């Protein structure tokens, strides 16, 4: 497995998902493709941060008020290899944490992410199509401060704040249908893939890659 050394300020190792053991590759599908509900192919993340324990997840912050642990709450619907440590999160989860930090500042209170409301692997039982949760760029927020987001009024209120603070964020429409929401605020950054500078990458070969033009 190819990794880079964790820095003094950020303890999680960067991992090339394509070089992980087969059991992890089969559930993370690094660099693979999922198809969204419009029939568009979306390329999955290739690079991940490795989380070796719950203690490390709780002690490592991606933003001043958001620890890694808040993005990896799962239940038995997650694929078995990702129910135990080590766990892997897409690098773009750090971008989501920064967006949530801005949202938290705007609402002036705590923001709570639900179980299975952060990163979910492509093999999670409830993953349907190309969910941004598989990119680590979506969060399901069930509570802000002392307010539970279990009504159209509260969800709409905080969705409007999210869109005002983060103009490019997407919030799920309200309603009882499966593709809508009525008991939490879903916000996501889309299909963002983050490749840190220290990622090894590959030498580009036009003959092998094909001329895109």
Enumerate the language-model features and the residues they cover.
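N-terminal secretory targeting signals
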Residues: 1-49, 205-213
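Short linear sequence elements within intrinsically disordered, low-complexity coil regions
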Residues: 29, 52-54, 124, 163, ...
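N-terminal start-of-chain detector that recognizes signal peptides
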Residues: 85-88, 110-116, 156-163
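Extended, low-complexity, intrinsically disordered C-terminal regulatory tails
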Residues: 95-128
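Active-site acidic/histidine clusters and adjacent loop/turn architecture
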Residues: 47-107
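Catalytic cores and adjacent binding grooves of peptidoglycan-active enzymes
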Residues: 3-13, 129-213
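A broad, structure-centric signal for solvent-exposed, well-ordered loop/edge residues
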Residues: 50-51, 58, 64, 122, ...
């Amino acid at each position: 497995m190819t990794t880079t050394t964790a820095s003094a300020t950020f303890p999680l190792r960067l991992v090339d998902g394509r070089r992980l053991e087969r059991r992890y590759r089969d559930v993370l599908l690094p660099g693979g493709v999922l198809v969204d509900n419009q029939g568009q192919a979306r390329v999955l993340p290739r690079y991940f941060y490795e989380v070796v324990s719950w203690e490390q997840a709780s002690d490592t912050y991606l933003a001043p008020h958001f620890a890694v642990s808040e993005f990896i709450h799962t239940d038995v619907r997650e694929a078995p290899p990702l129910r135990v440590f080590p766990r892997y999160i897409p690098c773009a989860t750090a971008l989501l944490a920064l967006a949530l930090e801005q949202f938290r500042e705007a609402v002036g209170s705590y923001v709570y992410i639900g179980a299975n409301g952060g990163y979910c692997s492509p093999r999670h039982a409830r993953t349907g199509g190309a969910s941004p949760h598989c990119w680590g760029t979506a969060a399901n927020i069930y509570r802000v401060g002392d307010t539970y987001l279990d009504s159209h009024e509260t969800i709409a209120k905080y969705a409007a704040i999210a869109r005002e603070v983060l103009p490019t964020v997407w919030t799920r429409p309200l309603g009882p249908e499966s593709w809508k929401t009525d008991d939490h605020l879903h916000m996501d950054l889309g299909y963002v893939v983050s490749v840190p500078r220290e990622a090894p990458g590959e030498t580009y070969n036009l003959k092998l890659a094909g001329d895109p033009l």
